[in-house]
């Protein structure tokens, strides 16, 4: 990729410019994953369409180039981190995990490109173009068994050295304890909010639902808990808050969004929910973090609300204040309802594994 301030990527037939940074790469990748998903669906319906195969091949090759570029950027950033401070250690851990994900993603893409090349050669989409995660899952199961004593180790560490535990234990454990602490803080905020709103009796239902959602998707408990807390704070019932959070998280993943993308999507959506207004600024923020999801929501809102056609476009309807949060909520739910068959990637599987371990450590914080 060029070293200038921006780079260009073709998505859905349109050339788009992105900031030449990790954030820009993540945004471009999100849009490309959404396009790849649509191309695969189209090939299931028209398995001899070699033009679609060629488009998918080009898409995957672009993703591969971006993944390699991301790995290079992460290595460069890692080399500048000061591991002598707790903040530096936390940043180093996050960057190391992101680097592993980027390199794994590149390996997966190389395999998918070979599958598509085979389909082009045969002239038929007669392959199951999903990543085989059997080996990955067995590897993760092995890691889980090796960490069966994780809780006992963590309890011992906390009792012996208290607050300095994070900097004293191994790299992986340090990251999981940090995640567990973030989850605990988010749980306390949820509990206090629910008590204040008068529905504290539903805390167990909401907290368990959010933890399960995090295990089943590429989100983490901290983000799902914070999002449900926002909805409850705005007056939603426990059931409604859980439903809205599940819809947002599942839709983000279904349209190629990562757990990191979810933070930006959730922030934009939460701000609109809090103000009760759909704004161009927040929609742009949502687009920056998940291009494919944003495009789908815009199209779905227009289809579900024929009265908006008088404005010519979704953006014009927003500018005129004609798009409500209720419209957006229903469109988000529809996007989530269509995601039940979404393929899990290696990254999603790994995110679930990290979440399992982080949640397993929660009891140690009260030991």
Swiss-Prot record:
One of its GO terms (biological process) is viral tail assembly. It comes from the Viruses. Keywords: Viral release from host cell, Viral tail assembly, Virion. InterPro entries: Tape_meas_N (IPR013491). The keyword RNA-binding does not apply. It comes from Lactococcus phage F4-1. Pfam families: TMP_3. Tape measure protein. Serves as a base for tail tube protein polymerization and acts as a template for tail length determination. The lineage of its organism: Viruses, Duplodnaviria, Heunggongvirae, Uroviricota, Caudoviricetes. GO terms for cellular component: virion component. Belongs to the skunalikevirus tape measure protein family. It is found in: Virion. Gene3D superfamilies: 1.10.287.1490. This is Tape measure protein.
């Amino acid at each position: 990729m060029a070293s200038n301030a921006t780079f260009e990527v073709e998505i859905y037939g349109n050339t788009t410019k992105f900031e030449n940074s990790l954030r820009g790469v993540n945004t471009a990748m999100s849009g490309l994953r959404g396009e790849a998903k649509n191309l695969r669906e189209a090939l299931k319906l028209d398995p001899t369409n070699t033009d679609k195969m060629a488009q998918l091949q080009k898409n995957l090759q672009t993703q591969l180039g971006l993944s390699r570029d991301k790995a290079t950027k992460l290595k460069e950033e890692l080399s500048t981190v000061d591991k002598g401070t707790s903040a530096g250690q936390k940043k180093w851990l996050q960057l190391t995990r992101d680097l592993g994900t980027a390199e794994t993603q590149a390996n997966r893409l190389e395999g998918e490109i070979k599958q598509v090349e085979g389909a082009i050669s045969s002239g038929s989409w007669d392959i199951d173009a999903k990543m085989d995660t059997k080996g990955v899952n067995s590897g993760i199961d092995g890691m889980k068994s090796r960490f069966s004593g994780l809780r006992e180790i963590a309890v011992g560490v906390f009792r012996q050295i208290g607050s300095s535990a994070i900097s004293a234990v191994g790299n992986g454990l340090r990251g999981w304890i940090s995640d567990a602490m973030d989850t605990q803080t988010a749980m306390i905020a949820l509990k206090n909010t629910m008590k204040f709103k008068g529905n504290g009796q539903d805390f167990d239902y909401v907290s368990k639902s959010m933890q399960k959602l995090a295990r089943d998707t590429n989100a983490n408990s901290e983000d799902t808990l914070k999002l449900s807390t926002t909805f409850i704070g705005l007056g939603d019932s426990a059931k409604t808050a859980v439903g809205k959070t599940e819809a947002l998280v599942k839709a983000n993943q279904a349209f190629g969004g990562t757990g990191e993308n979810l933070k930006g999507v959730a922030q934009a959506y939460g701000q609109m929910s809090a103000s009760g207004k759909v704004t161009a600024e927040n929609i742009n923020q949502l687009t920056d973090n998940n291009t494919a999801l944003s495009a789908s929501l815009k199209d779905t809102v227009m289809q579900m609300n024929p009265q908006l056609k008088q404005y010519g476009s979704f953006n014009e309807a927003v500018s005129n204040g004609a798009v409500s949060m209720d419209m957006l909520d229903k469109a988000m739910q529809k996007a989530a309802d269509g995601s039940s068959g979404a393929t899990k990637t290696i990254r999603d599987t790994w995110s679930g594994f990290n979440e399992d371990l982080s949640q397993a450590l929660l009891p140690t914080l009260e030991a």
